[in-house]
Every structure is written in structure tokens, then in C-alpha cells.
């Protein structure tokens, strides 16, 4: 039987409460979680090369979630990025196309099931040839 590798997730948000809440949820689901208060912190961290999926707030100072997605994909093509926000207007017209399954949007508040489902879908899409 093939062993399942533990997934390494990065959560990026400037709100400490969101970071802590998502850390608890994702660790309880069996993932290794790295927390970052800014996009710059993630991109500069040595763990960036081992991240399997990024979960990032869109509305952050300096580098927002869209720019983080662009920079992360430039460094690591195909890296799944899940963008979260409580502002629907930020994601209107930017929904995922059939060609780009590595981009996912979640509107806050989202359920545990929605987030874990989005992570599983993003990781499965990345593993397809």
C-alpha cells in the first residue's frame, strides 16, 4: 500500500484570528501548516519550496492575494492557490476557468467542509498529468 504524504499548507492573512482559526482547523485535518502575516513573509521563507498549497486572504496591505498568486506561480508554476475574502466585489469576474483549476475562491464565512474540499480538489488537480 502506498503511503500518503502529509500535505504542507501555507496560510497568509494579516488577521491573527483568521490565522489561528485556520491553523487549528487544518492541523486537525492532518495537514502541516505554516502561518504568514504577509505575502512577503511567505515568499522569503525557506519553507516556500515545500508548500503544497497556499491559502491567502485577498485584501492585505503591500502585496494582495492576487499579486501573491502571480508571484508564487512565477516561482512555482502550478502551485495551487486558494484566495479567500469577505468582499464579493473582489472576485466577481475572476472566477476560475476550466483551464486553471489551480485557482479557487472562497467567500468568507466559509465552512470547514468547503475549505477542506477546495484544498483536496486543488491538490488532486495538481497531481493529474
Where are these regions (language model features)?
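Acidic, metal-coordinating helix/loop segments flanking the phosphotransfer/catalytic sites
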Residues: 35-53
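Two-component/phosphorelay signaling modules centered on CheY-like receiver
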Residues: 16-34, 100
Amino acid at each position: 500500500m502506498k503511503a500518503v504524504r502529509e500535505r504542507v499548507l501555507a496560510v497568509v492573512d494579516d488577521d491573527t484570528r483568521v490565522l489561528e482559526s485556520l491553523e487549528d482547523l487544518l492541523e486537525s485535518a492532518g495537514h502541516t501548516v505554516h502561518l504568514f502575516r504577509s505575502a512577503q513573509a511567505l515568499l522569503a521563507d525557506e519553507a516556500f519550496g515545500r508548500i503544497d498549497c497556499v491559502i491567502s486572504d485577498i485584501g492585505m496591505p503591500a502585496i494582495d492575494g492576487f499579486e501573491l498568486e502571480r508571484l508564487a506561480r512565477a516561482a512555482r508554476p502550478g502551485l495551487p492557490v486558494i484566495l479567500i475574502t469577505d468582499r464579493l466585489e473582489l472576485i466577481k469576474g475572476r472566477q476560475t476557468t476550466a483551464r486553471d483549476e489551480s485557482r479557487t475562491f472562497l467567500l468568507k464565512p466559509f465552512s470547514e467542509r468547503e475549505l477542506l474540499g477546495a484544498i483536496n480538489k486543488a491538490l488532486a488537480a495538481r497531481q493529474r498529468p
